[in-house]
Amino acid sequence: MPKINQEELENILQTKINNLDLYLSAFTHRSYLNENRSFNLPHNERMEFLGDAVLELCATEYLYKNYSHPEGELTNFRSALVNYKMLSSIASRLGFEKFLLMSRGEAKDMGRARQVILANCIEAVIGAMYLDSGYQTCTNFIAREVLVELDNIIEDGKYIDPKSRLQELMQEKNGITPHYGVISETGPDHNKTFVLAAFVGEKEVGRGTGPSKQEAEISAAEDALKKNLF
């Protein structure tokens, strides 16, 4: 049975752990069980389901109590707080990767798949924390590690999705709406990679990659915003 350094994890989470197995399960990706049949704890997907609900409730409650914005903006704030990119960056900052249990194949993938695994992991850890210590402990952790990002999200306009931000900027500057085109599409049906470009008229202003056309468009819009070629 793999071991987790309880004292180290308690220091990271800033909470006392009563049942370490809950956290060991929270760090266990489904793929690990395929290579370790004797492992006698479940993978983290059910715990992730629970933690996702706790995280969303905590974020919603905080936004409702502290911000007077309309419902649509509060929803956008919350989405920016709990999307996989934000959660994976928080999990990386906390050093969760050292605790992850996954297959050798998954361990080699350092791209988007790893980001998703880390995002799911932090939700599972919140689920474990809820079962181990209750809602208030989760609230303290979420406020300290997740909600602290909110001011930057609002100040930088990160709650507005990149495609909407790019469109607003383009229409302000020259009244043109950007459009997107497929550059390439590779891979089998179950694991495709799309490369799309963002265009202003005939000029390419950004390019992005993703497992779906929608995500590649978002990536292209992000690239265009960074390059600011329009």
Kindly label every feature range from the protein language model.
Residues 1-230:
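Double-stranded RNA-binding/processing signature
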